Amino acid sequence: MSWLFGVQKNATPQIPDDFQAGAAPGGPQQPGQGQRQEGNSKMAYSFDSTALERAAKAARDLEKFPNAKEALELSRMQEVTRQKEVENETKKIEAQLANMKSEHIRVAEEERRKTLGEETKHAHSRAEYQDQLARKRAEEELAMKARMQEESLRKQEESVKKQEQLRKQTIEHELALKHKYELEKIDAETRARAKAARDNRDVNLEQMKLHEEENRKTVIEKIKTSGELIGSGLNQFLNDKTKIAAAVGGLTALAVGWYTAKRGTGVTARYIESRLGKPSLVRETSRITPLEVLKHPIKSVQMMTRQKKDPLNGVVLPPALERRLRDIAITTSNTKRNNGLFRNVMFYGPPGTGKTLFAKSLAQHSGLDYAVLTGGDIAPLGRDGVSAIHKVFDWASKSRKGLIVFIDEADAFLQKRSKNGMSEDTRAALNAFLFRTGEQSRKFMLVVASNQPEQFDWAVNDRFDQLVEFTLPGMEERERILLQYFNEHIVTPATSGSRSQRLKLDNFDWVAKCNEVAKKTSGMSGRELSKLVIGWQASAYASETGVLTEAIVDRNTADAMVQHEHKMEWLEKEQLKARNQEVKFGTTLKRETAV
């Protein structure tokens, strides 16, 4: 009913100046506070009489109004609503005051925290500064101590130097005095001896004359006595013919014995070496000697009891080459049986194609011994290379069973004599080889293997009756080689049943896998394929489980192919370089010939 008393509806109550936000609404009042509030309420709520008159008039009009009760109820409800709004406004103001107080507290705490931080920072800075000052003082003290120590050491060194100098001066003075005294002593002794010699000169001369006279008489008597004895002995010797003959015979026998011992020892040693030992150039041989029997008795017995076997056993070659090599083996065996002349053979082709293996098998099949030489061993011998070659062929000529002399890598010393840079020793060794192989022999057969036969001297090529080329294995040969080595190095150890054998074979078709690998390894030699299978075995041993899987085979095969490609690239570069050098040498030779 604010409209009855002239109070505006939207008027906001004023907050007293001395209102405290933290005081409770019904809290106790301070002394004198009630009187001030009473005086202020009279001033704040005083109204004039016109308002009452209007209210009375409005009440009378309202009583006359037919809807007076509803209007009164509406007014009461509006008054209640207004009171609620005033209460809400009051609560908002109280909340704002509380927020202001909390903000004031927060700001105060923030300021206090900042103050503490600044104080801490200042204290830290002060502590650091004090620490720096302390360190500086400590460093200065250490530096001062170091300077004092250096000064003390310097003074001590100077003192020691002075003492050492004084000691040296004292010693030098003592030595000088001692030397002076010794000189004076020697001078005095010399003068005394000289004076004594002058005083005793006549006596000394008389003694010397007597001594020399006695020596002269003694020497003359010795000469006379020796001459008489020698003369009487010669007279007796010359008058006795028996003694003369005995002396001449003794001297002759002594000379003959000395010469025989000197020359006979060397001849006997060479004979024993040629019969019992083997030449130094022979790297490997199946020929049994007494020395070999003493060194390796078991191996010697096995070699003596060995039987003939197929020369192509374990050697995988193309069919045409197998037929030709089998004919050579049969021819060699029949030649030995009929005591005919052996034919010299040259095997040429890429390395690792079975040349050395077939040469050894050929010797075992034909009943001959074999001796393996290496061409690279001759060049380091220098001037001794010629005698070493003669020893080899002399040793081969004395073989009772017959001997196959196999020279591997023969192009190392059988090169063309017109080649630039060939040493005189190598040329002499080549001439000795040509001399010993000029005619065919019934005692030995010469087999030479080379990777570069085009480097041979023409005279060397004329010594060979047959030239056999060993080519790289084809598809079928690679399959046979892989299966053979796989069975030897992997299948047999894996199925041996030995507890100490770690190798195991995974469940896969290894025959098909070998055929697949054979298709990928085109251009590889038999030795490379053997190393490939051995690499599979090594990888299986290196694995955690010791099982050879298909993945291990594929991985090692890929690595081997990459390595083979690198080798082929290196070989092509080397061949190109060699051809360029030959062309350059030929051009230079033509120019020199033209000049």
From Swiss-Prot:
Residues 80-107, 140-175 form a coiled coil. The chain crosses the membrane at residues 244-260. Residues 261-595 are mitochondrial matrix. It comes from Caenorhabditis elegans. GO terms for cellular component: mitochondrial inner membrane; mitochondrial nucleoid; mitochondrion. Residues 1-48 are annotated as: Disordered. Essential for mitochondrial network organization, mitochondrial metabolism and cell growth at organism and cellular level. Important during development for the up-regulation of mitochondrial activity during the transition to higher larval stages. Regulates mitochondrial iron homeostasis. May play an important role in mitochondrial protein synthesis. May also participate in mitochondrial DNA replication. May bind to mitochondrial DNA D-loops and contribute to nucleoid stability. Plays a role in regulating the production of reactive oxygen species in response to heat stress. A motif (PDZ-binding) lies at residues 592-595. Gene3D superfamilies: P-loop containing nucleotide triphosphate hydrolases. Disruption phenotype: RNAi-mediated knockdown results in an increased adult lifespan. RNAi-mediated knockdown at the L1 stage of larval development results in arrest in the majority of animals at this larval stage. Some surviving animals arrest during the subsequent larval stages. RNAi-mediated knockdown in young adults results in a gradual decrease in the reproduction rate over time whereby initially fewer embryos are produced as compared to wild-type animals, and eventually adults fail to reproduce. The few embryos that are produced by the young adults are viable, but animals arrest at the L1 larval stage. InterPro entries: AAA+_ATPase, ATAD3_N, ATPase_AAA_core, P-loop_NTPase. Residues 1-243 are mitochondrial intermembrane. GO terms for biological process: mitochondrion organization. This is ATPase family AAA domain-containing protein 3. SMART domains: AAA. It comes from the Eukaryota. Keywords: ATP-binding, Coiled coil, Membrane, Mitochondrion, Mitochondrion inner membrane, Mitochondrion nucleoid, Nucleotide-binding, Transmembrane, Transmembrane helix. The lineage of its organism: Eukaryota, Metazoa, Ecdysozoa, Nematoda, Chromadorea. GO terms for molecular function: ATP binding; ATP hydrolysis activity. It is found in: Mitochondrion inner membrane; Mitochondrion matrix, Mitochondrion nucleoid. Belongs to the AAA ATPase family. ATP binds at residues 349-356. It is a single-pass membrane protein. CDD domains: RecA-like_ATAD3-like (cd19512). Residues 20-35 have a biased composition (Low complexity). It holds the Pfam family ATAD3_N.
